[in-house]
Amino acid sequence: MYSNIELFTMIAIIVLLTKPLGTYMYNIFEYKPMRSDKIFLPVENFIYKITGINPEEEMDWKKYALTFLLVNMVMMIITYFILRVQQFLPLNPTGAKNMESSLAFNTVISFMTNTNLQHYAGEDGITFLSQMIVIVFLMFTSAASGLVTAAAIMRGLSKKTTNLGNFYADFVRITVRLLLPISMLATLILVWQGVPQTFAGKVVVDTLEGGKQTIITGPVAVLESIKHLGTNGGGFFGANSSHPFENPTWLTNMIEMLLMMLLPTSLIYTYGLMINNKKHALVLYISLFVIFILLAVGAVYAENHPGVAYSKLHIYGKPYGNYEGKEVRFGVSQSPLFATVTTAFTTGSVDSMHDSYTPLGGAVPLILMMLNTIFGGDGAGLQNIIMYTILTVFLTGLMVGRTPEYLGRKIETKEIKLIALAILVHPFLILFSSALTVMLKVGASSVTNPLYHGLTQVLYEFSSAAANNGSEFAGFIGNTVFMNIMTGLVMFFGRYITIILMLAVAGSMAEKIPAPPSPGTFRTDNAIFGAIFIAVVLIVGALTFFPAVILGPISEFLSMT
């Protein structure tokens, strides 16, 4: 009962914030005059001046995509070398060593792609300086990269020009006007609730037993805010948001979930304003929340009713649920709700150990990452939603014998080939990598559980990497050379191939002259379209991943009953 109240309270707050924040992002993307210009314009102009950026330069989709890639590659190279020499740099109170080459490769790709898959423990694997100028820096820039490429795609679908904007100007504006202000406010709230923000490093305390204990602190709050606002997910500590210094109270737990949901939901309203069709955006908004609520309720129910196998242990049962791997302060209801939010919005932070969930409870976050469309992360999620929207319109047009049109522009062979390729990249990366891992001894050695749960561990690892989520079944051994390279490549291709293909779709659609709606135009702003959209998302996901899910969590569930 409590979890349902929390779920719908959280959704109500997000719904109230969607319109004002969505409008604000629209004004940022469209360069509208704002009252805050007197604060932000001088900062932006200073950045343009010292970097030599010309914010008036126009870019077509090819130049926008190339600039996006080059900027991201440069940031990855610089941060890679910082991690490789971090022990020789200042602000290293914990004595962290230089990061091993394959782990550094995995880490910089992980954070630059907004995945934040962590094969290291933050307490001793990385310095305070690296936390700030590598981890936090990439958390801001990866979120900004996703948001501005989404803005470029929205312009391509809504404008009568092939100019998709200026990557540099978009990047600066979204960072200065959106990510930094909200992160600063969230940081202050988290500090108020007890999250550390200090350079003190180690604190040695006397325990009740008379011994000594070393407690690691650090600049945690500033990381924690952008970690969730930017749908990043990487933790300052190895235990992530289950650690009391990252997530000390039920209020911080709620705030972190709200931060994860804030930008992806509001971006759908921004999309409605950009295409001048708020009803269409509302249909997408409701459709996605329908799927999200059903899966959230399912996850909470599965963890509260763990089944016969748990009841026989005489420590679990209907009154208590599955407490294994969960923090007592969050319990068996808040934990799966957090797991649903973190995988639906591709953040990847965890306040409980997903590897300890029941088979069906663990299947929910796995399915959300496989679908990779239920809101998703900052910017990248909207791109996937648009991808499935165009596919839905195309399939519907084929069924009724009409030429498919979206926003007045015909969907032709070129666009649908690009869309099909973008959709296929995600399952190919997951299934091929999972199959290769279980076939090779060097990969199978990372699996720590037999039979069905072991396969689920592998599927979860690569689903998380391909979806740019970053959460893990923590029992899986990720920090090996093979897994660092494999997941690094999956994260890289899962991020950049899809974004570039969607920019190409936007560029192709921008070249077409939009036609006014006719009586034969399939409407995308009613309940019929919403139902078909849900069906397409679920059917495509089911057909692609159903055999693997059957062999993993569903078989494990059946074996326990």
Curated annotation (Swiss-Prot):
Subcellular location: Cell membrane
Leader sequence segment: none
Pfam families found in the cross-reference section: KdpA (PF03814)
InterPro entries hit by this protein: KdpA
Membrane topology value: Multi-pass membrane protein
Keywords: Cell membrane, Ion transport, Membrane, Potassium, Potassium transport, Transmembrane, Transmembrane helix, Transport
Presence of the UniProt keyword ATP-binding in the record: no
GO molecular function: P-type potassium transmembrane transporter activity; potassium ion binding
Major localization class: membrane
Domain of life: Bacteria
Membrane-spanning segments: 5-25, 63-83, 103-122, 133-153, 179-199, 255-275, 281-301, 380-400, 418-438, 485-505, 531-551
GO cellular component: plasma membrane
Subunit note: The system is composed of three essential subunits: KdpA, KdpB and KdpC.
Similarity section: Belongs to the KdpA family.
Biological function: Part of the high-affinity ATP-driven potassium transport (or Kdp) system, which catalyzes the hydrolysis of ATP coupled with the electrogenic transport of potassium into the cytoplasm. This subunit binds the extracellular potassium ions and delivers the ions to the membrane domain of KdpB through an intramembrane tunnel.
Protein name (database record): Potassium-transporting ATPase potassium-binding subunit
Lineage: Bacteria, Bacillati, Bacillota, Clostridia, Thermoanaerobacterales
